[in-house]
């Protein structure tokens, strides 16, 4: 369809706005200033508010949040509390909350769910890492920013307002703040995102964009646009930029983090920068954009020329301050990330949090900040407590995770040198792909890689090229910022397509009923489709029910598009139209119910023990055991496992009712929060809520006990680290726990009987035996060393001279450790040692003056591997044949 949007609105006509075309960038814009020729945005116009605040009074960030929210509340908009910065809490297509509209996608924007309020106002913290390398350098970029927004969701039956009112509200707010209307321009633009599109205005004053007003009304299909039934007012006001413009500080960072910045400057011993230089630099910083120019030095040169300073001197002066700005921004970003429960890891949102954290730690090292990152983030939490008290409630977790991650970072850096040296040994250039691999696989920041390579170049025999792009972290973040659907390899046969109505699920209304009558709607392949069923289809981590239909075994139950497919052992016994009788295997169902309810109980217990940050990433509910995967930043200790198990069984014994209700999606989210999606994102406007009173609330479609006492004893069998940042708990319930405990008891009794001691003496005895074994092992190693020293003299006269090397090829009786001890005593200078034992073990070791690689040698005389100075493996030829091969190699 052809789109010809008229950007003229009622306000423009009433106040006499003129439509003009910018003489610099050719964009069309609206202005009250008859003499204006440019659009007002940078780089067409420089910042003109620095040193000259543009509002009636100076606003702090907190004051601006309140001012914005109160203004739109007065205009009939219902305030809505913020959502987490982790968008994965309610959607599965993006990781972080990148805009206020993301809070309402996809359910509200697709028209599937009504908005919680309409119209509404929200001040939503957002995180975007696609500009992370600009932060600190441009004066305006932030990783974490607050998008103030008023949204109206217009339908035919419920129309609120559109372009006229939206522009009017914007102009009125800016006037109320004291911004001169003649300085405000509305640039005509177009917005696209998430498959939707629409015209928009970019609202500019004094060289800075303060707001974007989007009118979402199209769906993009290929290269075409189609109108959507819901017309959405999607605005975004930069709360931080409003506060900045109201204060007129050189950069946005001073307006937000003045206390933190001063503390960091004092700690790092960074002197103040001349105000004239800083003001001029900050004004021109509006023209700086790393993603467009790609080279910080080119940008710095422009600033240096403008203020008449040597570029190196300017860089030396400003760079430390830019690092401090970045640290201030990043620590606020981390406060939101960890405060909203992200657990650092090597995947997804955990990867992004670790990226921001390690970049911050690197910058702190670079400028010599001695205070800990915990102290900096504590300051941030204190400053944000008035608006975001929930972040301070997570302080204990935030401090713990910072401790854990800082230790991991130090370990990474310590082992990093060896990793880089090994890579550099075989390369003439460390490429961008190499840098990304070193960062992704080993966690090594590119600056550290460059430091190691620069040192190698100073003392090495060759020069290794390396260039770290100014936008490295942006490149890496963009690769990880979008959620990619995981590839699931299914072992199940794909279900057939059938045209029948959705199956009525009887187990929701009758959870304890085992028999039912139903009509056969379709028979296809080995599946029977009924109009209603008591059989639970596999889903939500829970295994399917089994049983019989008309005496024929039901061996699998699956669901597709609301239709339940019953796989039976003999499909020939069914035809369409039959009235059949189904019977669910109750013993099997009961085990599944117990284990599924136990999953919710253990999740609740783990939250109490480990903290509110834990989030369920997966589960598996079978008849014999259950499995729960949760996020956590370190291994769960034995003491923590015992406490989780104790609390879980306390909940069981408390006989808590397990209630099942269907709720409106908005009502459920407002009442319980996004933790209802622990088991995964659930589609639709109605959710089935499982509530264990006072314990746990989740949106869940599984079968459950009616009371926690029905679960029986819960036994946590084991925990394991299935990936970085994710712990798996395996557990049993009821008689399954009795069986598992019996196995453990048998193991205990059998072990005690073998040692001939009472059960209660087993730990003490095993510990004593272990200590004795360690002592004996130490004695054996010392004896092996002495044997090696003695054998050294026996073998000293058996070396043969071949070229520049003295070579020993000898068959020796002993263990690999004993042969290693012998070789250690002999491999010095120009000596080359090849030892073999009676079990085909082969050892090659060289002295420090031998240039031949032992790794290459062992591949020629046997099979194995190792390093250049030492290799181990197996041999198949005799001593004479091996000696002959070595001579040939040395004579080449």
Swiss-Prot record:
Annotated GO CC locations: cytoplasm
UniProt keywords, alphabetically: Aminoacyl-tRNA synthetase, ATP-binding, Cytoplasm, Ligase, Metal-binding, Nucleotide-binding, Protein biosynthesis, RNA-binding, tRNA-binding, Zinc
Protein name: Alanine--tRNA ligase
Compartment list: Cytoplasm
SUPFAM superfamilies: Class II aaRS and biotin synthetases, Putative anticodon-binding domain of alanyl-tRNA synthetase (AlaRS), ThrRS/AlaRS common domain, Translation proteins
Cofactor list: Zn(2+)
List of residues binding Zn(2+): 596, 600, 700, 704
Domain of life, per lineage: Archaea
InterPro entries per the UniProt record, alphabetical: aa-tRNA-synth_II/BPL/LPL (IPR045864), Ala-tRNA-lgiase_IIc (IPR002318), Ala-tRNA-ligase_IIc_anticod-bd (IPR018162), Ala-tRNA-synth_IIc_core (IPR018165), Ala-tRNA-synth_IIc_N (IPR018164), Ala-tRNA_lgiase_arc (IPR022429), Ala-tRNA_ligase (IPR050058), DHHA1_dom (IPR003156)
Molecular-function annotations in GO: alanine-tRNA ligase activity; aminoacyl-tRNA deacylase activity; ATP binding; tRNA binding; zinc ion binding
GO terms (BP aspect): alanyl-tRNA aminoacylation
């Amino acid at each position: 369809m052809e789109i010809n949007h008229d950007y003229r609105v009622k306000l423009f006509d009433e106040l006499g706005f003129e439509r003009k075309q910018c003489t610099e960038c050719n964009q069309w814009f609206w202005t009250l200033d008859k003499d204006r020729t440019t659009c007002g945005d940078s780089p067409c116009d420089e910042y003109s508010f620095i040193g000259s605040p543009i509002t009636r009074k100076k606003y702090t960030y907190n004051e601006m949040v309140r001012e914005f929210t109160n203004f739109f509340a007065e205009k009939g908009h219902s305030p809505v509390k913020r959502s987490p910065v982790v968008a994965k809490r309610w959607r599965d297509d993006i990781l972080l909350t990148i805009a206020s509209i993301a809070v309402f996608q996809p359910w509200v924007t697709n028209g599937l769910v009504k908005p919680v309020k309409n119209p509404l106002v929200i001040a939503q913290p957002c995180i975007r890492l696609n500009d992370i390398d600009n932060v600190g350098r441009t004066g305006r970029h932030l990783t974490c920013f607050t998008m103030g927004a008023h949204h109206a969701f217009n339908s035919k039956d419920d129309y609120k307002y559109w372009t006229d009112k939206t522009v009017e509200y914007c102009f009125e707010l800016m006037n109320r703040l004291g911004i001169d209307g003649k300085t405000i321009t509305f640039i005509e633009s177009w917005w696209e995102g998430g498959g939707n599109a629409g015209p928009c205005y970019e609202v500019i004053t004094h060289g800075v964009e303060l707001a974007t007003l989007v009118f979402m009304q199209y769906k993009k299909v290929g290269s075409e646009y189609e109108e959507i039934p819901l017309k959405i007012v999607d605005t975004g006001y930069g709360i931080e930029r409003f506060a900045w413009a109201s204060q007129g500080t050189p950069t946005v960072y001073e307006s937000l983090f003045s206390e933190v910045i001063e503390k960091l400057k004092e700690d790092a011993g960074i002197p103040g920068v001349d105000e004239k230089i800083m003001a001029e630099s900050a004004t021109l910083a509006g023209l700086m954009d790393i993603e467009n120019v790609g080279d910080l030095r080119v940008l710095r040169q422009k600033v240096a020329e403008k203020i008449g300073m040597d570029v190196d001197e300017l860089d030396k002066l400003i760079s430390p301050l830019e690092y401090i700005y970045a640290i201030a921004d990043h620590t606020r970003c981390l406060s939101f990330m960890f405060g909203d429960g992200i657990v650092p890891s090597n995947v997804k949102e955990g990867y992004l949090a670790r990226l921001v954290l390690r970049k911050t730690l690197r910058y702190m090292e670079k400028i010599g900040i001695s205070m800990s990152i915990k102290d900096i983030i504590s300051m941030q939490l204190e400053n944000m407590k008035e608006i975001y008290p929930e972040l301070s409630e997570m302080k204990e977790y935030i401090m713990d995770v910072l401790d854990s991650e800082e230790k991991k970072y130090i370990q990474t850096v310590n082992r990093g040198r060896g990793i880089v040296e090994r890579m550099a040994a075989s390369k003439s250039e460390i490429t961008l792909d190499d840098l990304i691999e070193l960062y992704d696989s080993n966690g090594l920041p590119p600056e550290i890689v460059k430091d190691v390579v620069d040192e190698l170049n100073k003392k090495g025999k060759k020069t290794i090229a390396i260039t770290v792009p100014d936008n490295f972290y942006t490149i890496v973040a963009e690769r990880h910022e979008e959620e990619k659907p995981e590839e699931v390899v299914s072992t199940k046969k794909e279900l057939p397509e059938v045209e029948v109505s959705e199956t009525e699920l009887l187990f929701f209304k009758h959870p304890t009923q085992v028999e039912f009558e139903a009509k056969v709607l379709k028979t296809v392949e080995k599946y029977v489709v009924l109009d209603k069923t008591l059989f639970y289809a596999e889903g939500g981590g829970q295994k399917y029910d089994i049983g019989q239909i008309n005496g024929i075994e039901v061996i699998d139950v699956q669901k597709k598009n609301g239709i339940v497919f019953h796989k039976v052992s003999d499909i020939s016994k069914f035809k369409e139209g039959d009235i059949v009788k189904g019977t669910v295997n109750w013993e099997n169902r009961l085990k599944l119910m117990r284990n599924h309810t136990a999953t919710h109980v253990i999740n609740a217990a783990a939250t109490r023990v480990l903290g509110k940050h834990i989030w369920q990433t997966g589960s598996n509910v079978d008849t014999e055991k259950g499995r729960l995967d949760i996020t956590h930043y370190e291994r769960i200790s034995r003491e923590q496992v015992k406490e989780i198990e104790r609390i879980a069984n306390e909940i069981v014994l408390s006989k808590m009712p397990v209630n099942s209700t269907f709720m409106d999606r908005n009502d459920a989210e407002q009442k319980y929060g996004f933790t209802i999606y622990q088991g995964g994102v659930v589609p639709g406007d109605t959710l089935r809520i499982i509530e264990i009173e006072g314990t746990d609330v989740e949106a869940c479609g599984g079968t459950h006990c009616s009371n926690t006492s029905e679960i029986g004893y819960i036994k946590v069998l084991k925990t394991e680290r299935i990936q970085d940042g994710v712990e798996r708990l395996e557990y049993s319930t009821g008689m399954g726990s009795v069986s598992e405990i019996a196995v453990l008891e048998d193991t205990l009794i059998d072990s005690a009987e073998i040692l001939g001691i009472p059960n209660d003496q087993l730990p003490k005895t095993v510990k004593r035996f272990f200590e004795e074994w360690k002592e004996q092992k130490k004695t054996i190693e010392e004896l092996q060393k002495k044997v090696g020293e003695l054998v050294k003299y026996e073998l000293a006269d058996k070396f043969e001279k071949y070229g520049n090397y003295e070579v020993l090829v000898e068959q020796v009786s002993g263990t690999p450790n004993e042969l290693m001890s012998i070789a250690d005593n002999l491999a010095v200078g120009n000596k080359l040692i090849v030892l073999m034992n009676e079990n085909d073990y082969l050892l090659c070791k060289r002295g420090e003056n031998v240039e031949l690689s032992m790794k290459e040698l062992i591949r020629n005389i046997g099979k194995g591997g190792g390093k250049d100075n030492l290799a181990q493996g197996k041999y198949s030829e005799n001593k004479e044949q091996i000696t002959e091969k070595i001579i040939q190699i040395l004579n080449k």
